[in-house]
Amino acid sequence: MSDSHLTAFDKASKAGFIIALGIVYGDIGTSPLYTMQSLVENQGGVNQVSESFILGSISLIIWTLTLITTIKYVLIALKADNHHEGGIFSLFTLVRKMSPWLIVPAMIGGATLLSDGALTPAVTVTSAIEGLKAVPGLSHIYQNQTNVIITTLVILIVLFGIQRFGTGFIGKIFGPVMFIWFSFLGVSGFFNMLGHLEIFKAINPYYALHLLFSPENHRGIFILGSIFLATTGAEALYSDLGHVGRGNIYVSWPFVKMCIVLSYCGQAAWILANKHSGIELNPFFASVPSQLRVYLVSLATLAAIIASQALISGSFTLVSEAMRLKIFPLFRVTYPGANLGQLYIPVINWILFAVTSCTVLAFRTSAHMEAAYGLAITITMLMTTILLKYYLIKKGTRPILAHLVMAFFALVEFIFFLASAIKFMHGGYAVVILALAIVFVMFIWHAGTRIVFKYVKSLNLNDYKEQIKQLRDDVCFDLYQTNVVYLSNRMQDHMIDRSILYSILDKRPKRAQVYWFVNVQVTDEPYTAKYKVDMMGTDYMVRVNLYLGFRMPQTVPRYLRTIVQDLMESGRLPKQEQEYTITPGRDVGDFRFVLIEERVSNARQLSNFERFIMQTKASIKHVTASPMRWFGLQYSEVTLEVVPLILSDVLKLPIKELVPVEDSEA
């Protein structure tokens, strides 16, 4: 990687600063909407809190943001970039060669990130709309929670509905809106604090530790379940690394942290000033003058939509990476924008919409949603910590130091996990069930692939080279196609899937001028696009290894077109001049892609567990995208063939011929 690229990645700019605000900080930036409300309501209301409770709560928030977000993610995780890309799957590709079991924390972390993230639009948008209860002139309408739910659902329908068209046209305003949002958080919090400067004492971690064991804290250690809401968006700082660059996050995070800490302190000051008033409004909205609340609700709604959009886009990216790493079923992916990073996965979009909408309808209020929110993300953070430990060791950190540092973060996050475990009975079970379902699908897909590689026979292509040449020259067979292309799962040392040779020679002899055997390998680098060619000493058999990054689309025909041109220009492949064509000088013949669907024909060798995995994977494949779409073959000539996936030698069944009686008497 060149120094200029590294400099650009680490360099900050004014434009990058604004862009980072709109992409990275939506989730963590909207946490002030509901974190203090959750703390106060779980304590019994505004009139049940004391100064020591408030100081302890703010101290816990400050030090949680410092330890987890600043130290772990900003100072440590951001250095673990995979060619400028971040996120749990990028981190996994950096360390997966160190141990085969690391696929487990990667799958669990990805699944919990997806499942818990499905609650983010529900919590943030509902919290913002509930602010209308504090707006004079509208409060009488929105005191009825049904109206809040209806408004929230309308916003969600529009938000998820526009995903298919791409969001680049509105993405340009995200940064400026979030800059205004964070500026408002900081300014309003600062002015609210002026009457209660004792809030600054919360910087001392003594107040945080004291509150955990204080009798004034009605929830004990379980208060950390509400505190954790302040840092649920920390994972996004790492996941969105590739979108904005490390330098812009380094510069923007201090500004963001200052603004949200000031907001929490301002809400705390308002609570101390009104703890005997009996007001039961969300401190975030109640701490602002009533004449400004309608503008604040509008701004909060925009911020909530931006946070939700970041979550949706992040989910598409996460699933896309999992598919290319072959740990998730293939779903149709489209690119509605000009940028390859702007992708859209219809199935995932509408699953997220269904989960989010059901969450709003089932929990109804943001307070009830908060009770279930954050449980799964603690698991994601633990899984990231495990992978980070291996990364530090790989980069030369002394193992004892890497173990100690990551053990500290694992302990902190495990305590948060235990504190959030109480949420399981308050709705967190729904998120856990969704996460388990995603992990199950990932496991089945990954394990099924391993079983195929374990049992399926492969053959040496060199042993059949002469047969293929005879077939190519045998005019008794009609020309099947000028170029026939097979996609192979394996092509090492001239070994190829048995099913491909079965298709060429046994299923129906396919005469062609050139036989192409293409293998797509996903690399650990995100944006690789390279290939290797082996002509096998012929001009009619071509082995192609495509090396594509885990964030690159696997549109095989587009790459193959370039490869064919390169081979013809170098003289390694004869030109295929066309007699009939509307394109003068066309020297490439027609192509047909043969896709092979392998079905288990004899599973005698499989254990019951392996048979269950293969059958389940086959069932899942019925609802996934076809390989034709995944490899970009929609506009190509494609033949789909079903061949037996022979896992063991087929046993002959005993049978006897019935001999006619008259013949036996003779």
UniProtKB/Swiss-Prot annotation:
Pfam families: K_trans, K_trans_C
Keyword Membrane: yes
Keyword Ion transport: yes
Topological type in the membrane: Multi-pass membrane protein
Catalytic activity line of the entry: K(+)(in) + H(+)(in) = K(+)(out) + H(+)(out)
Transmembrane segments: 16-36, 58-78, 100-120, 149-169, 173-193, 221-241, 253-273, 294-314, 343-363, 373-393, 399-419, 424-444
Cross-referenced InterPro entries: K+_transporter (IPR003855), K_trans_C (IPR053952), K_trans_N (IPR053951), Kup (IPR023051)
GO molecular function terms attached to this record: potassium ion transmembrane transporter activity; symporter activity
One annotated Gene Ontology cellular component of this protein: plasma membrane
Keywords: Cell membrane, Ion transport, Membrane, Potassium, Potassium transport, Symport, Transmembrane, Transmembrane helix, Transport
Localisation: Cell membrane
Known role: Transport of potassium into the cell. Likely operates as a K(+):H(+) symporter.
HAMAP family according to UniProt: Kup (MF_01522)
Family the entry assigns: Belongs to the HAK/KUP transporter (TC 2.A.72) family.
Protein name per the record: Probable potassium transport system protein Kup
Gene: kup
